[in-house]
């Protein structure tokens, strides 16, 4: 019987103390929140359970009890049975840290009464007072209790942040901030990055009262961090729509203070989220809209990166921002738009800049235009590239390497295809005597295939080009690549098939990929049968054909509607007496927008 009892004790000890290897918690950990927790804890210990047994992350039952805000009697029992009140888990957190984090006023007070050290530090250097500073809503009471038991109100964590700094970084903690200051917190202590509590409050708080509280208790409104930012710089980057900027300026913040890279608060606001309100406020208080930083970048340059670029640009331009200002690399705001990652469509931003005189052909120090820059952007936006072209960007402009935007786009077949649709030159070389086709073969065969389709089409549209030395060189390059030979043959098949479909003695279906004369095409478009527009009919030039035919049909519809409307509303006998062909010729001199206005305004 004695042997059995001893064996039973050994087995139970193994069970109680090792069950956590299979499960996260031991029975002792689970017991702390049961109604009869004290009795169960005593029973487990009497059966051989280790009072200091740990679960995952090296937490004891006391850690669990503190985190789950167990009754003071449970905490007292665990400690009286042998748990160290300042025991730490794998994160070096004590039970007191957990009690404070969980907003546990009663548990916190009990642990302190039982000897918990209010200045013990978590692995990141934070004391329970740091934790209390971030607790809502009982932060002020927790702070008072901890300081009453000896907590250092200016304790520093591993980043040199005080409890006041952590409170300032959160919203809705002004009462906690007031309590900390009342108990001796220093408002001027900087962390390792030179950041003061006022910097943090200016950037994070939606309540300007927090900012005012810190200033009224001695915070330096123009204090600079290691990057040279003042609290006003930080407020300008904040997403919050608050009165913080006005509050800082009211208390003496320098609106044109420059940080270590030369950015003013207006620079920061320009590139921030939700910038419009902040820009207007700063400008109203004297911010220089044409201030330049260390590389001559203005707020207008940076506004192109905002999530509301168009509105930000509009505010700056309305207040005198120079739309063609250049940085030290010769880049204008239009260049910056070409590299913007804004989630907003940038077409309206381009329209706004052009409307106010921005040079869409401006060149940077290496001769690159906004178009060439956009074509060399790994996160390219086809709509933006097309917008540049539609607003007059020269598709064949050359940089100092004698390269056109096509060279910049070689790695991106979608961009190459777009440039081909606008007839970018292919029979050219750069200063290294390399053609776009040769560059594409070396970098992206998909782009090479697209370029071949344009080379063959150009030869069809402009027969004289066949005598050009670079064209001959391109054709030789094609013949040396089996894959490109197949593309060439497919191109020629499409062209010959279109040529075989005749409308009359002069024109066939091929005119729609050969000519850009929209009036000529609109006069012939009624001959085009829908079967020719089906996706499988022309594998190479089908898209180009469809685009041309649809544009011609739209043009014809506008012409017909305009003639009909003018015939119905005019009392001029001369107009009605004109032959229909002459009416077409007269209206054909108008653009699509003019015809659309006739239809819209006279209907």
Swiss-Prot record:
> Which Gene3D superfamilies does this UniProt record tie to the protein?
Ankyrin repeat-containing domain (1.25.40.20)
The parts of the chain that form a coiled coil are none
Keywords, A to Z, come to: ANK repeat, Repeat
- Xref: SMART domains: ANK (SM00248)
Transmembrane intervals: none
Query: Which Pfam families does the annotation name?
Result: Ank_2 (PF12796), PRANC (PF09372)
Q: Where are the ANK repeats?
A: 23-53, 57-87, 91-120, 124-155, 159-189, 193-223, 227-257, 261-291, 295-325, 329-362, 366-397, 401-428, 432-467, 504-533
Q: Which PANTHER family match?
A: ANKYRIN REPEAT AND SOCS BOX PROTEIN 2, MYOTROPHIN
What protein does this entry describe?
Putative ankyrin repeat protein FPV162
| Species of origin | Fowlpox virus (strain NVSL)
